[in-house]
């Protein structure tokens, strides 16, 4: 929105802006903020904050951190009562001035710089498709003597027998793909979200009800360069959640909130360009792919077990990555084939449209880390000319057992991918994009704050299995 400090100050004065919302991303991938009066904001000055209070950042004895504005990300907040401009910031060390190695936005910025330094390409485009659910009510709690969650939706398949306010037209389990209203209860809500996205610079291409019951949705918008695409995804989540909120609903990007129905994925489309020309197209190649594209795929598939530590980084992620729910559990590539983890969309003979789609990721990921890790894996494939296994153009869910045994499968748990990341991370550290400190911090954070607490707690289903044993 702005290119320099003068533009900011002029806009603030001319448009009666009251507040500047200072935003930065924590390590797990949740946007943080604090607000200052617009009249006191100097875009050229650093702002201080306590890094020890942010997940995955600093210890208390070295907690002071500095923020520097990225003015190109400025947007007027559509949800605040008083006129407010949201600006994303980079995090720096207040003493040395160096980029903070655990700042997700800095990592994405370094990934783009590393790409240019390789000479392979100068631009990487990313187009995520983040699915989500819309609910009317959600309750959850864990304590010493109870553990439960309860979700509800007017469109939920479980509400066909509801006594009050029931006019039928519920979305069946796995039956939500494309039915027209009144079965699609949320067409107007998605339209409202789409209009808000367009106002905020995200060009919507299509929106629809997804396969799952209870309002599962997908809204696609135009791709962008790596850092900008990650910023766009954070803005997308913010708008989806807040439009749902002001309509008395609640939206979640949790990968698997409903047992027995499809989870929410985040297919990520990717392409490399050099000097304004696309690098992934070759009309002579399989599915129109160039050697560069094929090697890029080879890098992602080779490093997939460790890569998933960033693209599928939660315990809940692996409730989605199971057979039977259209999840991409087979680590192969194929054209058109949605049962493959790496799909080559049919794009005709237009070189600019040629791209690869990695279907394993989910929207619980931190997009700055996930996109950076995908790029680093792909570049490792290009640099080392890593050939993927032969493409498979048949339904991978229906393979004979002897064929299926030869197909690499996704890891089945968060502990497994963290172990893989511990063993395979050199490709991430090329050019100093990911540091060993960041990788070690990520692994420790996930093991300590997510895996261990879940392992300590009895699951409600265990009572069904074992109470009367």
Swiss-Prot record:
<feature type="binding site">
    <location>
        <position position="129"/>
    </location>
    <ligand>
        <name>Mg(2+) 1</name>
    </ligand>
</feature>
<feature type="binding site">
    <location>
        <position position="338"/>
    </location>
    <ligand>
        <name>ATP</name>
    </ligand>
</feature>
<dbReference type="InterPro" id="IPR008146">
    <property type="entry name" value="Gln_synth_cat_dom"/>
</dbReference>
<dbReference type="InterPro" id="IPR008147">
    <property type="entry name" value="Gln_synt_N"/>
</dbReference>
<feature type="domain" description="GS beta-grasp">
    <location>
        <begin position="15"/>
        <end position="96"/>
    </location>
</feature>
<feature type="binding site">
    <location>
        <begin position="221"/>
        <end position="223"/>
    </location>
    <ligand>
        <name>ATP</name>
    </ligand>
</feature>
<dbReference type="InterPro" id="IPR027303">
    <property type="entry name" value="Gln_synth_gly_rich_site"/>
</dbReference>
<feature type="binding site">
    <location>
        <position position="271"/>
    </location>
    <ligand>
        <name>ATP</name>
    </ligand>
</feature>
<comment type="function">
    <text>Catalyzes the ATP-dependent biosynthesis of glutamine from glutamate and ammonia.</text>
</comment>
<feature type="binding site">
    <location>
        <begin position="269"/>
        <end position="271"/>
    </location>
    <ligand>
        <name>ATP</name>
    </ligand>
</feature>
<feature type="binding site">
    <location>
        <position position="267"/>
    </location>
    <ligand>
        <name>Mg(2+) 1</name>
    </ligand>
</feature>
<keyword id="KW-0460">Magnesium</keyword>
<protein>
    <recommendedName>
        <fullName>Glutamine synthetase</fullName>
        <ecNumber>6.3.1.2</ecNumber>
    </recommendedName>
</protein>
<dbReference type="Pfam" id="PF03951">
    <property type="entry name" value="Gln-synt_N"/>
</dbReference>
<dbReference type="GO" id="GO:0019740">
    <property type="term" value="P:nitrogen utilization"/>
</dbReference>
<feature type="modified residue" description="O-AMP-tyrosine">
    <location>
        <position position="397"/>
    </location>
</feature>
<dbReference type="GO" id="GO:0004356">
    <property type="term" value="F:glutamine synthetase activity"/>
</dbReference>
<keyword id="KW-0547">Nucleotide-binding</keyword>
<dbReference type="GO" id="GO:0005737">
    <property type="term" value="C:cytoplasm"/>
</dbReference>
<keyword id="KW-0436">Ligase</keyword>
<feature type="binding site">
    <location>
        <begin position="262"/>
        <end position="263"/>
    </location>
    <ligand>
        <name>L-glutamate</name>
    </ligand>
</feature>
<keyword id="KW-0963">Cytoplasm</keyword>
<feature type="binding site">
    <location>
        <position position="131"/>
    </location>
    <ligand>
        <name>Mg(2+) 2</name>
    </ligand>
</feature>
<keyword id="KW-0597">Phosphoprotein</keyword>
<feature type="binding site">
    <location>
        <position position="263"/>
    </location>
    <ligand>
        <name>L-glutamate</name>
    </ligand>
</feature>
<feature type="binding site">
    <location>
        <position position="218"/>
    </location>
    <ligand>
        <name>Mg(2+) 2</name>
    </ligand>
</feature>
<keyword id="KW-0479">Metal-binding</keyword>
<feature type="binding site">
    <location>
        <position position="343"/>
    </location>
    <ligand>
        <name>ATP</name>
    </ligand>
</feature>
<feature type="binding site">
    <location>
        <position position="326"/>
    </location>
    <ligand>
        <name>L-glutamate</name>
    </ligand>
</feature>
<comment type="similarity">
    <text>Belongs to the glutamine synthetase family.</text>
</comment>
<dbReference type="InterPro" id="IPR027302">
    <property type="entry name" value="Gln_synth_N_conserv_site"/>
</dbReference>
<comment type="subunit">
    <text>Oligomer of 12 subunits arranged in the form of two hexagons.</text>
</comment>
<dbReference type="InterPro" id="IPR014746">
    <property type="entry name" value="Gln_synth/guanido_kin_cat_dom"/>
</dbReference>
<feature type="domain" description="GS catalytic">
    <location>
        <begin position="104"/>
        <end position="469"/>
    </location>
</feature>
<feature type="binding site">
    <location>
        <position position="338"/>
    </location>
    <ligand>
        <name>L-glutamate</name>
    </ligand>
</feature>
<feature type="binding site">
    <location>
        <position position="320"/>
    </location>
    <ligand>
        <name>L-glutamate</name>
    </ligand>
</feature>
<feature type="binding site">
    <location>
        <position position="210"/>
    </location>
    <ligand>
        <name>Mg(2+) 2</name>
    </ligand>
</feature>
<feature type="binding site">
    <location>
        <position position="359"/>
    </location>
    <ligand>
        <name>L-glutamate</name>
    </ligand>
</feature>
<dbReference type="InterPro" id="IPR036651">
    <property type="entry name" value="Gln_synt_N_sf"/>
</dbReference>
<feature type="binding site">
    <location>
        <position position="357"/>
    </location>
    <ligand>
        <name>Mg(2+) 1</name>
    </ligand>
</feature>
<dbReference type="Pfam" id="PF00120">
    <property type="entry name" value="Gln-synt_C"/>
</dbReference>
<feature type="binding site">
    <location>
        <position position="205"/>
    </location>
    <ligand>
        <name>ATP</name>
    </ligand>
</feature>
């Amino acid at each position: 929105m702005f290119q320099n400090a003068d533009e900011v100050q002029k806009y603030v004065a001319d448009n009666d802006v009251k507040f500047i919302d200072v935003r930065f991303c924590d390590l797990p991938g949740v946007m943080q903020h604090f607000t200052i009066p617009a009249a006191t904001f100097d875009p050229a000055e650093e702002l201080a904050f306590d890094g020890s209070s942010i997940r995955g950042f600093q210890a208390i004895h070295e907690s002071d951190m500095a923020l520097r504005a990225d003015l190109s990300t400025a947007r007027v907040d559509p949800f605040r009562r008083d006129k407010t401009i949201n600006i994303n910031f980079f995090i720096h060390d207040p003493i040395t001035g160096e980029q903070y190695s655990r700042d997700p936005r800095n990592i994405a910025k370094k990934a783009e710089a590393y790409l240019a330094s390789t000479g392979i390409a100068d631009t990487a485009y990313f187009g995520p498709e983040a699915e989500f659910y819309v609910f009317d009510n959600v309750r959850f709690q864990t304590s010493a003597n109870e553990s439960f969650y309860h979700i509800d939706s007017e469109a939920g398949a479980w509400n066909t027998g509801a006594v009050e306010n029931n006019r039928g037209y519920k979305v069946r389990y796995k039956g939500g793909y494309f039915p027209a209203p009144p079965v699609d209860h949320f067409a107007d809500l998605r339209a409202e979200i789409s209009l808000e996205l367009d106002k905020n610079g995200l060009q919507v291409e299509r929106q629809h009800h997804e396969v799952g019951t209870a309002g599962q949705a997908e809204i696609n918008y135009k791709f962008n360069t790596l850092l900008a695409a990650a910023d766009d995804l954070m803005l997308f989540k913010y708008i989806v959640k807040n439009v749902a909120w002001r309509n008395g609903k609640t939206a979640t990007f949790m990968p698997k909130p409903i047992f027995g129905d499809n989870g929410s994925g985040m297919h990520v489309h990717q392409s490399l360009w050099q000097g304004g020309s696309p690098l992934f197209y070759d009309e002579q190649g399989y599915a129109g792919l160039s050697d560069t594209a094929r090697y890029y795929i080879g890098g992602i598939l080779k490093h997939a077990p460790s890569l998933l530590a960033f693209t599928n980084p939660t315990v809940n992620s692996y409730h989605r990555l199971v057979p039977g729910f259209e999840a991409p559990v087979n680590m192969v590539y194929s054209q058109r084939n949605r049962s493959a983890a790496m799909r080559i969309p049919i794009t005709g003979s237009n070189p600019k449209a040629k791209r690869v789609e990695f279907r394993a990721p989910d929207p619980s990921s931190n997009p700055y880390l996930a996109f950076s890790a995908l790029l680093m894996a792909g570049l490792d494939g290009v640099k080392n000319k890593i050939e993927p296994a032969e493409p498979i153009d048949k339904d991978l869910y229906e393979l004979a057992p002897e064929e299926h045994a030869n197909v690499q499968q996704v890891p089945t748990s968060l502990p497994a991918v963290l172990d893989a990341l511990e063993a395979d991370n050199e490709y991430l550290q090329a050019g100093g994009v990911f540091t060993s400190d960041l990788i070690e911090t990520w692994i420790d954070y996930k093991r300590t704050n997510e895996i261990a607490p879940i392992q300590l707690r009895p699951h409600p289903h265990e009572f069904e299995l074992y109470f009367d044993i």
